[in-house]
Amino acid sequence: MKLNELYNNIGAKKNKKRIARGIGSGKGKTAGRGIKGQKSRSGVAIKGFEGGQTPMIKRLPKRGFKCISTKKYNIINIYNIEKALTDGRLSTNNIITKEKLIEIGLINNKNLVKLLSICSDDFASPLSLKLDAYSSKAKYLIEKAGGQLL
């Protein structure tokens, strides 16, 4: 047996059906779409249409709503600020603002900023912070360290 004598088993490789290639092909003229009507035209996909039965979107109940006045917060942890201080990206003499946090890469957009104190039980640096919101524990830790919230 040689490489040029190899061939596929019968039925292993099936040619795809070529539609709209003449009447003799069996799928010519109307190309299997029937005669006239909406589904015989091009661009037929009707989103959500289930052939007359009530669509899924109407069978399921409405749930909840999106409040348009919800405030979106960037969450930042005291631990991250402490790490930025030890790395030298922030200094204790300056007021820490949202713009400064964007500049050093701790947050990446202009949404409101909320300071949390997850997994932080002590904070030693006296900082001046001007952010949009603070958790009660974060407030307590900063004021205990001699910092101030503007």
From Swiss-Prot:
Gene3D superfamilies: 3.100.10.10. It comes from the Bacteria. Transmembrane segments: none annotated. GO terms for cellular component: large ribosomal subunit. Belongs to the universal ribosomal protein uL15 family. Binds to the 23S rRNA. Part of the 50S ribosomal subunit. This is Large ribosomal subunit protein uL15. It comes from Rickettsia typhi (strain ATCC VR-144 / Wilmington).
